[in-house]
Swiss-Prot record:
The keyword Isomerase does not apply. Usually encoded in the trnK tRNA gene intron. Probably assists in splicing its own and other chloroplast group II introns. GO terms for cellular component: chloroplast. Pfam families: Intron_maturas2 (PF01348), MatK_N (PF01824). The gene is matK. This is Maturase K. Its main location: plastid. GO terms for molecular function: RNA binding.
Length: 523
């Protein structure tokens, strides 16, 4: 975004608030496809599921030339004939042009939001706000807060029934009318195009592979609208707590001057005082926390089960009356934290209870006190990861490693490097797991799948190939953090293996979820 701001400073003229002219600038398309801008230190890109993100500058120039032709978009808008519409799809709705236009449009829409975000952190004087972008920054927050809470509610945020609802939300944020017309035209025609090939039961609009960036931005704007009203009602309940029950008592005594009703009035005031205290405390819950990633949200509270049900029906009614679509109540589950583990961001999280007996000595008497401590625990979802590995053709459904035939044509170093990067990415992302032994099974599957792929390429057996390579193959699957931790623990404490298995590390520059973890979450 800093590079984009530099380009925008050069193009500032009389049309500072217009985004439509940026459609004819080549550098916008270059920035839209520069995936290195969103890279991370501990994320090494590797193609796992076969996505192709290649771009061509010559095709971009050809696209801009076609857009300059005024009858290009007008003829598509006025055309209602399906046969003629299918003629236009050869150019405008081909896979490449649809992708580059949508991702470039997403760049335009991100401009006002990015400026607002930077100004917000500048006003709040938050120096290292980039660390807040990390996915791992959520887990230290959960470690501090969840141990004091009682109930957790898992919310699966529904997708709007019509894609036009997503576009209407941006009308209040963007003032460029031509750009809004272009966005509305693109969304409507994209909806019509997909309706020719995709059934009504599949909602593919938000997580479309071809238009991932645009629909992710539109969906986040829709979720921001939901969370804005959630924060609004949360603040309103906070202000209700400011109505003091003591003031209610004084006013009651002031207006009631009849001496004969004094005893009954005092009883009435005590009842009202207790009732109002409970009611206002019910509306204002200081121990409520909300965390979201993509469509999955977690709402945790220290209140009662009845309070969580009220928030549940608030969400259902809000989606129904504000966004005009029905939300299924079973999408929101309410569970007690003491005996429940929830899946969030690639981890199974739960609260572990540890009982501790403490002997207390008072003068000549001594007695035991049983204390219970709660600890936030995170574990690797082994079964879900194995299912994701089976989809990527690394193993069977039962977890038996198999070869990767599509990579058999690569060189030996490339094959080992690809498997090693996948293994290191998983190790970095799941570095916060309390039991590293669960991750060793995933590493074993990848390591043996790599050996089977190499053996298939050289038409040999796995045992023969491993004897020839020796320990060189295993070194590629070790991460830097494991080597550093083994070095540190070997110098500081004799319990090297014990400490390395239980040490949890959260990285503050992992800004994207691992592909294998993401696919296991969506499955």
């Amino acid at each position: 975004m800093e590079e984009l701001q530099g380009y925008l400073e050069k193009d500032r003229s009389g049309q500072q608030h217009f985004l439509y002219p940026l459609l004819f600038q080549e550098y916008i398309y270059a920035l839209a496809h520069d995936h290195g801008l969103n890279s991370s230190i501990f994320y090494e890109p590797v193609e796992i599921f076969g996505y192709d993100n290649k771009s061509s500058l010559a095709l971009v120039k050809r696209l801009i030339t076609r857009i300059y032709q005024q009858n290009f978009l007008i003829s598509s808008v006025n055309d209602s004939n399906q046969n003629r519409f299918l003629e236009h799809n050869r150019f405008f709705y081909s896979q490449f042009y649809s992708q580059i236009i949508s991702e470039s449009v997403a760049i335009y829409v991100e401009i006002p939001f990015s400026r607002r975000l930077v100004s917000f952190f500048x006003e709040k004087e938050i120096p290292k706000y980039h660390n807040l972008r990390s996915i791992h920054s959520i887990f230290p927050f959960l470690e501090d807060k969840l141990s004091h809470l009682n109930y957790v509610s898992e919310i699966l945020i529904p997708x709007p029934x019509h894609i036009g609802i997503l576009g209407q939300i941006l009308q209040c944020q963007i003032q460029d009318v031509p750009f809004l017309h272009l966005l509305r035209f693109f969304l409507d025609e994209y909806h019509n195009w997909n309706s020719l090939f995709i059934t009504q039961n599949k909602s593919i609009y938000v997580f479309s592979k071809e238009n991932k960036r645009l629909f992710r931005l539109l969906y986040n704007s829709y979720v921001f609208e939901c969370e804005f009203f959630l924060l609004f009602f949360r603040k309103q309940s906070y202000y209700l707590r400011l109505t003091s029950s003591e003031i209610f008592l004084e006013r009651t005594h002031f207006y009631r001057k009849i001496e004969q009703l004094r005893i009954e009035l005092e009883h009435f005031v005590v009842v009202c005082r207790n009732y109002f205290h409970r009611t206002l405390w019910f509306l204002k819950n200081p121990f409520m926390h909300y965390v979201r990633y993509q469509r999955k949200a977690i709402l945790a509270s220290r209140g009662t089960h009845f309070l969580m049900k009220k928030w549940k029906y608030y969400f259902v009614n809000f989606w129904q009356y504000y966004f005009h679509f029905w939300s299924r109540p079973y999408r929101i589950n309410i569970n007690h934290l003491s005996n429940y583990s929830f899946y969030f961001l690639g981890y199974f999280s739960s609260l572990l209870k540890n009982s501790l007996a403490v002997r207390n000595q008072m003068l000549e008497n001594s007695f035991l006190i049983d204390t219970i401590t709660k600890k936030f625990d995170t574990r690797v979802p082994v079964i879900l990861l194995i299912g994701s590995l089976s989809k990527a053709k690394f193993c069977t459904v039962s977890g038996h490693p198999i070869s990767k035939p599509i990579w058999a044509d690569l060189s030996d170093s490339d094959i080992i490097d690809r498997f090693g990067r996948i293994c290191r990415n998983l190790s970095h992302y799941h570095s916060g797991s309390s039991k590293k032994q669960d991750l060793y099974r995933i590493k074993y599957i990848l390591r043996l799948s790599c050996a089977r792929t190499l053996a298939r390429k050289h038409k040999s057996t796995v045992r023969t190939f491993l004897r020839r390579l020796g320990s060189g193959l295993l070194e590629e699957f070790f991460t830097e953090e494991e080597q550093v931790l083994s070095l540190i623990f070997s110098k500081t404490t004799p319990f090297t293996l014990h400490g390395x298995h239980r040490a949890r590390i959260w990285y503050l520059d992992i800004i994207r979820i691992n592909d294998l973890v993401n696919h296991s979450x969506l499955s």
